[in-house]
Amino acid sequence: MTKQRHLFTSESVTEGHPDKICDQISDSILDAILSKDANARVACETTVTTGLVLVAGEITTSTYVDIPKIVRETIQGIGYTRAKYGFDAETCAVLTSIDEQSADIAMGVDRALEAREGQMTDAEIEAIGAGDQGLMFGFACNETKELMPLPISLAHKLARRLTEVRKDETLEYLRPDGKTQVTVEYDENGKPVRVDTIVISTQHHPEITWEQIDRDLKEHVIKAVVPAELMDEETKFFINPTGRFVIGGPQGDAGLTGRKIIVDTYGGYARHGGGAFSGKDATKVDRSAAYAARYVAKNIVAAGLAEKAEVQLAYAIGVAKPVSISVDTFGTGKVSEEVLVELVRNNFDLRPAGIIKMLDLRRPIYKQTAAYGHFGRTDVDLPWERTDKAADLKEQAGL
């Protein structure tokens, strides 16, 4: 069947979006705990609404952290510092409801089923079983230098730039909440050729005109981020298309941890297993295995074994080894997918403890991932973005 030209759209949000506030609070608490207790078990959920933050979850740790203080510092860092924004770091109420991790779950995670049944020794690897059942996907493609799909890459860069011009006061009338969306046109060969549509909605001071916002965002945000050669006279721009965005943040919408899982990953370009990341320590395979799957997929593409690769991992609670590993190259593979799966098994330890060791995940590195995407980041050093396995994969594949 002949491929046709088509459009694909992805979105991102700024750090001041209500759901992203929650992700950042949850990961700030996680980082604070991990900085003192690397073996802590953390599952921390946050919700925000007008004047209120609720932090709930299960945390098992030997240390103490001041959760309300962390919450307020995080909100302040985002920029909600005045009551007229509808949400203020100093005056909002902070409620906490924290329990310990279930003993039933801990029993499966502390020593994996294989260790309990004598199939492997604790000395072989710290015998950590998966903290839950589930399926996770990782993806990479050669559309950008960071091996990410172009639509989500541009959407994240626009969202980050929107925050930069607010914080450095280039556009001092902007407020923290905002969203971006980019539609890319692909040719008959599936290659991105142009940007078709850009949508930006940003919270702003009530007295600023739409005309000024439109002019300023095109000049200081879009032109600064989107390569000129990707835009043409047919590219459409929708800047604050409702005409006004004054009420925003938690005053405009309640927020929850884990409600921006497509923004966090590949913008809908690849499949998603459904599990969120923020607030979870690395024994939760929702997070660690999704990072490992990205690491695997990125190294496959970096090795030139495929132009795009999607890796699926699946786990059973309390069992260390993945119950399945699959690779889909969408017809772009230089070797068969069976060969790729075998290469993955031989080069990556995808048991939870193996992932933690391979990617050094017991560190406070998570808050920086909680806005602007967990993958394809060039502004921070994330271990799952390394391509240090690519040369070995290429050699073993005989290419």
Curated annotation (Swiss-Prot):
UniProt xrefs under InterPro entries: ADOMET_SYNTHASE_CS (IPR022631), S-AdoMet_synt_C (IPR022630), S-AdoMet_synt_central (IPR022629), S-AdoMet_synt_N (IPR022628), S-AdoMet_synthetase (IPR002133), S-AdoMet_synthetase_sfam (IPR022636)
One Gene Ontology cellular component: cytoplasm
Location relative to the cell: Cytoplasm
Keywords per UniProt: ATP-binding, Cytoplasm, Magnesium, Metal-binding, Nucleotide-binding, One-carbon metabolism, Potassium, Transferase
CDD domains found in the cross-reference section: S-AdoMet_synt
EC nos: 2.5.1.6
UniProt main location, coarse: cytoplasm
Catalytic reaction equation(s): L-methionine + ATP + H2O = S-adenosyl-L-methionine + phosphate + diphosphate
Pathway assignment: Amino-acid biosynthesis; S-adenosyl-L-methionine biosynthesis; S-adenosyl-L-methionine from L-methionine: step 1/1
Domain of life where this protein originates: Bacteria
Binding residue positions for Mg(2+): D19
Family membership noted in the UniProt record: Belongs to the AdoMet synthase family.
Protein name per the record: S-adenosylmethionine synthase
Annotated source species: Bacillus cytotoxicus (strain DSM 22905 / CIP 110041 / 391-98 / NVH 391-98)
Lineage: Bacteria, Bacillati, Bacillota, Bacilli, Bacillales
Gene that encodes it: metK
